[in-house]
């Protein structure tokens, strides 16, 4: 039961009141997407890039004047994005079935498109660790139909979580027991890896939860994988973790905030299903939210962890 309900927030636990201030409201920044996903913040340029997957384009929102423009079209049905430690865009591309990096001169570098000689399924979401390794999920969504990619059989025959070694580019499986691995993020100290499984989209009794793994001391493998939180409305898709270790999880009724102990603290209420989020703004305290058709934002009393 909610302790408090405003036009923008639902307080479930009193701890949420320290994170979501009652006088701040959700803003709609843009509408007109077919399916918004994968927001990524560019601090140097003060702009946000996100995907409109079925429309095969990426959009850009500028903080300075609030304008929205096409960043890239076609976009290879790009889904999730992140920004690496050098400030370059790293993207998951459905159509090309790869993880790519956009260089400063605009050239595109393929970081991974195969594992053990076989094509990846359709990379979905991606994160870069402080050691510069790239971790990504590879479910089947982009090869299930032509709507968000290219209907094709899986060459790998499994939906895995992978790591790209920063020294030699080698691609290794770090977790394989998933139905549909989706969003992923590290805890602030990078000792934990959280991964969403949205397998209920393919199996009626499939998972709709986030799992938590312990990262090995060498940063190359994980162990554990217990269920951290189960989504009560829809699925937990993309998410981010703040400096205090709270998870900000996209869900069917908005954004759920779960503490590091797994308990639900509260919700940011959005009038459509949410697919992904990211922190941005000069103080990294503005949460950008990709609803189905629209881009939203809200200022919070917390922020993203500092980058190494």
Segments the model singles out, each with a brief description of its role:
Residues 1-308:
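Sequence-structural signature of mature extracellular/luminal beta-sheet repeat domains
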